[in-house]
Amino acid sequence: MQMIKKMVLSETFPGILLIFFTFLALLCKNSSLSVIYTDFFHANFTVGFDHFQISKSLDLWINDGLIAIFFLCIGLELKYEILRGQLKNIRAVSLPIFGALGGMITPALIFIAINYSHDFAMKGWAIPTATDIAFAVGILMLLGNKIPTSLKLFLLSLAIFDDLGAIVIIALFYTDQLSALAIIICLFCIFALLLLNYYHITHLSLYVLVGVVLWIAMLKSGVHATLAGVIISLFIPLDTKNKKPYLHEVLKDLNPWVVYFILPLFAFANAGIDIRDMHLGSVFSPVSLGIILGLFLGKQLGVFTFCFIAIKLKLAKLPENIKYGKFYGICILTGIGFTMSLFIDGLAYKNSDIFEYADKLAILVASFLSAIVGFIYLKIVK
């Protein structure tokens, strides 16, 4: 029993759990269990009363709801590190911002260069700009204490800025319409959170209440609802009025739910991609090449190059006691686009099979390549 407890509480176990549920989802989707798997996650669940109801399929409740809690955790960790930890220095926090910019601009340019002559294909230019923070973190968890905290923090920070960039891209280029009323309600909720923070109120139930209203308004606004988690994290106080740690305690309570329940469930719901109708030859189509080269090469080169230039111009600095060799390994992991890229793919091509699933296959290939190469590289490099 002690051995099982030790294994479950180890740093690598959450990563193993995530990988296990990823392959379980692929197995279910590509076997006789496919119909049961699809029906289960597409089953509608309705929450509400009288004239106010939210009805969504289970996979959307997970992707829009539970993942907002994951983003809340990441936001809390980032806030703590910026105010009290390793990112207090402006040059330290600017590094992931430059990395995120490079990781979005370079893949997009690669995709555009390959697909510029095909109007419909060009709708997918943003597909290789995304990083799946959940899976990238999962690979880091597998490496355990081999990766310094400062590098883990860099990846988390970069992925947040990257996902914020993705949310802006979705809002500007892939949202049919925005609801003005819902956005006004969002602003009122943000003002309420600001007041709670200003008066140093540490009743978690009040933050939950305002947070739920903010999440619903965000959902109805047309902006991706997971952004609500990041916004809430900005306003949770660091300490109580008696100067006792508060934010850290909230993070400690939420973290087990995220790593042992939310992330594995997210992997199981999203990794189920039917690869039976995909043809390996379609990997060499322009759309596929744009996605694969954009995610696998564009991401790592863009992140590293932008960071390197920023460091040389003294606009940012490399984390303490970290060499460029190890740093490059983290840059490789940013090419894991997986569920975030699949999400943008669905918005760009409206789930069309015009490319015979070559786009989805390319996302899988590039993401697995980035994960495997990044893992091996970080395992070898000292």
Swiss-Prot record:
Keyword Transcription regulation, does the record have it?
Answer: no
Q: Which UniProt keywords apply?
A: Antiport, Cell inner membrane, Cell membrane, Ion transport, Membrane, Sodium, Sodium transport, Transmembrane, Transmembrane helix, Transport
Location(s), subcellular: Cell inner membrane
Q: Does the keyword Transmembrane apply?
A: yes
Alphabetical list of InterPro entries matching this protein = Na/H_antiporter_dom_sf, NhaA
Transmembrane segments annotated in the record for this chain: 7-27, 58-78, 94-114, 124-144, 153-173, 178-198, 199-219, 255-275, 291-311, 327-347, 361-381
One GO term under biological process is: regulation of pH
Q: Write out the catalysed reaction.
A: Na(+)(in) + 2 H(+)(out) = Na(+)(out) + 2 H(+)(in)
One GO term in the molecular function aspect is: sodium:proton antiporter activity
Identify the main location.
Answer: membrane
Which top-level group of life is the source organism from?
A: Bacteria
Q: Gene Ontology terms, cellular component aspect? A: plasma membrane
**N-terminal signal peptide:** none
Check the record and name the Pfam families matching this protein: Na_H_antiport_1
User: What is this protein's function?
Assistant: Na(+)/H(+) antiporter that extrudes sodium in exchange for external protons.
Please give the family membership noted in the entry: Belongs to the NhaA Na(+)/H(+) (TC 2.A.33) antiporter family.
The name of this protein is Na(+)/H(+) antiporter NhaA 2
Q: Which organism is it from?
A: Campylobacter jejuni subsp. jejuni serotype O:2 (strain ATCC 700819 / NCTC 11168)
Report the gene name: nhaA2
